[in-house]
Amino acid sequence: MAKEIVGGFKFDQRHGKERVQVARVWKTKQGWYFIVEWRVGNSLLSDCVNSYVRDDNSDIVATDTMKNTVYAKAKECSEILSVEDFAILLAKHFISFYKQVTAAIVNIVEKPWERVSVDGQPHEHGFKLGSERHTAEAIVQKSGALQLTSGIEGLSLLKTTKSGFEGFIRDKYTALPETHERMLATEVTALWRYSYESLYSIPQKPLYFTDKYLEVKKVLADNFFGPPNVGVYSPSVQNTLYLMAKAALNRFPEIASIQLKMPNIHFLPVNISNKDGPIVKFEADVYLPTDEPHGSIQASLRRLWSKL
């Protein structure tokens, strides 16, 4: 927030445009189409305090102008680029184009359009909607200082065995039985902050951040599931979350910190009886899926040298 002392009070302000929907299509010389669909939010920290305390809008960048800028900059992108690179591009524009703007915050959620295959062949121009969403946030200061965060929303993971929960606190309110055999399901939200601290330090390789996103997603999923034939036992969501986050930091030195949110989405054993006896006897086979209420587990790991 842009901070001022106004009328004897501390005053913080910023303004922007949220939920700007934009899609961009590219066609290669070989005839292949590519598409991205983004939901963009812009927020500017600027010297426009007079618009709040006086009848003076002369320092305001109109939010409608911010919306139009999203489309104009998308039009200028002649080459396919990552969601992170587009966020940085927008933020750089705002801090350089407007002398009043001291910092820009751009956050984007990418809709997961995936190329389809027909008869075993990738389709040149056909796409289907996937599930998890790629997110990015770029905070760029007038000085060129950068904070870049990537993330995943809605990564649904489930394993039907190799999970348990034992040894927890028991008291007069506890009804949950201990178990060493249960289903484990979650919907991962992940945020990781890169260690790049300026616009001049980010990699210039095309689609670098898209590739990194796919690699981080794979590491998180692989450590949730374990090896394909034997899996890995999870004594709690907490332990699994920690091991997933630790694996990401160990694998990617360019990541300074990572935060994971992993709700424990319950699949309840089904036992149904009447006066004549069992109708359904649970034998690790029939469950009642329920997403409310659910356990809420989250944690973050950061490197000791990280200033974040």
Curated annotation (Swiss-Prot):
CDD domains: Uricase. It is found in: Peroxisome. It catalyses: urate + O2 + H2O = 5-hydroxyisourate + H2O2. GO terms for molecular function: urate oxidase activity. One of its GO terms (cellular component) is peroxisome. Urate binds at residues 63-64, 165, 182, 237-238, 264. A motif (Microbody targeting signal) lies at residues 306-308. Keywords: Nodulation, Oxidoreductase, Peroxisome, Purine metabolism. Transmembrane segments: none annotated. The active site is at 17 (charge relay system), 63 (charge relay system), 266 (charge relay system). Its EC number is 1.7.3.3. GO terms for biological process: nodulation; purine nucleobase catabolic process; urate catabolic process. Catalyzes the oxidation of uric acid to 5-hydroxyisourate, which is further processed to form (S)-allantoin. Belongs to the uricase family. PANTHER family: URICASE. This is Uricase-2 isozyme 1.
